[in-house]
UniProtKB/Swiss-Prot annotation:
<keyword id="KW-0812">Transmembrane</keyword>
<feature type="compositionally biased region" description="Basic and acidic residues">
    <location>
        <begin position="63"/>
        <end position="76"/>
    </location>
</feature>
<keyword id="KW-0472">Membrane</keyword>
<feature type="region of interest" description="Disordered">
    <location>
        <begin position="1"/>
        <end position="98"/>
    </location>
</feature>
<dbReference type="GO" id="GO:0016020">
    <property type="term" value="C:membrane"/>
</dbReference>
<keyword id="KW-1133">Transmembrane helix</keyword>
<feature type="transmembrane region" description="Helical">
    <location>
        <begin position="261"/>
        <end position="281"/>
    </location>
</feature>
<feature type="region of interest" description="Disordered">
    <location>
        <begin position="209"/>
        <end position="236"/>
    </location>
</feature>
<protein>
    <recommendedName>
        <fullName>Uncharacterized protein ARIH2OS</fullName>
    </recommendedName>
</protein>
<feature type="compositionally biased region" description="Low complexity">
    <location>
        <begin position="87"/>
        <end position="97"/>
    </location>
</feature>
Amino acid sequence: MLGQRAGDGERPGLPGDGEGGVPARPGRRAERPPQRPAKVNKAVTCAAHLPGAAASRPLSPNKPDRVRPGQRDRIGAKRQRRRRADAGQARAASSRRVVPTAPEVLGAVASLPDRGRPTVARVATGSRLEGLFSAASLKLSALTQSLTRVRQAPTASGATIRLPASPVEMFLTSAFLTGFSFHCLYSGIGHGEDILASVEQITIVSRPLSGQRGAGPGNSAYTPRRSQGGPRAATTPGFRFPCRGLVRRAVLRLTVTVQDCILTALLAVSFHSIGVVIMTSSYLLGPVVK
């Protein structure tokens, strides 16, 4: 019985079963190599809690799960990449010297007017007007430089005369037009003074001829003489104006002279304005003489 029990307890293929081998000791389990644990799919295990996750399955069907070389330490690689990215962002922030904004600064920025509000519109309008004025000043300076640059005009003898500008530009210069206006005014005033002097000459002072109370039809009872004291001398006692038509003609001439002065002034102003318009148009369309 013992031999049979021992034989019953022997492992097949071992001695004692007719095949040779080491008989098993009673009371001890036969020594077998432990089974290796099956590999688990970590991706499936991590995503098992998500809705719609697929059922867990082995990496290799009908075979024990094995980790391929490309699947090793994926989580560690992700963590390393994340650390590198964080370090790069920190270096970029330190290089830009980013300073955290204080709450009061944010409040001040929020209180600024938005685009489209009247304050911003006024500021934009002021800047636009300032830009227009600066552009106009630049145009005037360029026009002045173009008018004052030296020109050379050939003469009949072959010599050249250095001119500050072309004759047309000189005529259209504001200084020339202003001088022309003053010249017209001065000439008009001088013309008026000449008329006043002629009025004094035309004034006739009555003086009886010596030894004659009367005069015949062929003799003149009065001789014209220029008054020594001006027009006031004609109003002295003993003098009278025998011919009122001359005085009327003198007054008419004086009125015409005043009108002539006014007309001259108006023409001078109109010439000046026309010159400015022509000068502006010539600048916009291009130089008059190249």
